[in-house]
């Protein structure tokens, strides 16, 4: 799966939305004290931004994401892998980047959740 998604992730990085570009400017280079990657492959998904150290994913949504069932499934799967997912509307990033960054900073300074004990994940073995 990763071999298929990696070229797509690179294409997405090269064709970022305005909101992604604005937020990346603030996240890159450890500007917030933590390293972020953009358009990163995690399992069968490509996430907009991820901080592996804090197990935090940031997703930016345009109008096409107005309560999408696939987004809910994706978030549940990412949560099951130990990631917290913050979602912001593109317009929020473009109009209130400081407010969005404040929410991200608050989350970055929370302690990491305790991972489930081995064998207690919600994904059944096949």
Tell where the protein language model's regions lie, with residue ranges.
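Solvent-exposed, charged helical/coil patches
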Residues: 1-32, 111-117, 121-126
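Alpha-helix termination/capping residues and helix-transition junctions
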Residues: 30-33, 80-82
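Basic, amphipathic alpha-helical patches used to engage nucleic acids or provide basic targeting signals
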Residues: 12, 16, 43-108
């Amino acid at each position: 799966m990763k071999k298929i998604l990696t070229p797509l992730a690179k294409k997405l990085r090269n064709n970022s939305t305005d909101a992604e570009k604005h937020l990346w400017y603030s996240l890159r280079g450890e500007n917030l004290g933590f390293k972020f990657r953009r358009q990163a492959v995690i399992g069968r998904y490509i996430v907009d931004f991820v901080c592996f150290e804090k197990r935090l994913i940031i997703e930016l949504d345009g109008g096409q994401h107005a309560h999408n069932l696939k987004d809910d499934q994706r978030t549940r799967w990412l949560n099951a892998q130990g990631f917290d997912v913050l979602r912001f509307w593109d317009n929020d990033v473009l109009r209130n980047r400081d407010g969005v960054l404040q929410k991200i900073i608050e989350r970055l300074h929370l302690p990491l959740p305790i991972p489930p004990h081995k064998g207690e994940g919600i994904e059944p073995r096949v």
